[in-house]
């Protein structure tokens, strides 16, 4: 994970403000935990962190602001034209050292069942953001390679550049990483690397209710939880 953070901050394709989009196969895969943990980790390193959220949902940006103290903006291609989205993104992120964009639902899930319009994929394409795919790897091995292959090849130019494995032990991670990168190389996607993992740890469990209104005591607990997640990552 340390190498992933270093690469993100040295992305030559985005000289002024490096950033990436965190997406997943589906909801409840660990996107929010990963996004919040990484924001916390970068802040602890003294970086100026900026956040975005795909879609019109206001709850996650509110969570980014209230719990992490990170300015956050919605990136919505359903209500906004592409040019307006690009302009808003550049204005929002211009003073940041790193920008983390949190996806919505699954990577290709848009505003309707049969369209990618407004999806995380759509936003990544529009802004030219590299994508890190968060995958719940608990109870899986070789099948993970098949899942990645299917998602990467479902549409052209997916922009997926990294895989973040969720719910993986420190002991198993090196073996899963080696297997996945070998398989990805074999099927012609050697540019995609496994960039890190999140262990099975309570600090990465953010219940849905935590993303709404919380009491002052819950706020303190959440801030401490996210701080610990950042230290682990």
Language model regions located:
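Short hydrophobic alpha-helical runs that function as membrane-insertion/retention elements
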Residues: 131-134, 195-196
């Amino acid at each position: 994970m340390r190498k992933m953070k270093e690469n993100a901050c040295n992305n030559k394709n985005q000289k002024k403000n490096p950033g990436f989009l965190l997406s997943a196969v589906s909801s409840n895969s660990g996107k929010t935990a990963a996004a919040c943990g990484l924001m916390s980790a970068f802040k602890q390193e003294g970086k100026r962190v900026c956040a975005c959220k795909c879609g019109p949902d206001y709850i996650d940006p509110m969570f980014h602001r209230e719990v992490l103290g990170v300015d956050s903006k919605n990136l919505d291609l359903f209500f906004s034209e592409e040019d307006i989205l690009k302009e808003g993104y550049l204005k929002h992120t211009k003073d940041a050292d790193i920008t983390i964009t949190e996806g919505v639902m699954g990577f290709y899930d848009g505003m309707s069942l049969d369209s990618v319009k407004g999806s995380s994929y759509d936003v990544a394409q529009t802004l030219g953001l590299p994508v890190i795919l968060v995958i719940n790897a608990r109870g899986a091995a070789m099948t993970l390679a098949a899942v990645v292959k299917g998602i990467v090849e479902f549409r052209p130019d997916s922009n997926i550049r990294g895989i973040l494995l969720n719910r993986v032990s420190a002991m198993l991670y090196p073996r899963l990483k080696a297997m996945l990168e070998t398989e990805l190389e074999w099927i012609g996607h050697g540019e995609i690397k496994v960039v890190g993992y999140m262990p099975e740890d309570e600090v990465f469990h953010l219940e849905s209710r935590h993303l709404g209104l919380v009491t002052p005591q819950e706020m303190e607990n959440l801030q401490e939880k996210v701080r610990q997640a950042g230290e682990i990552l």
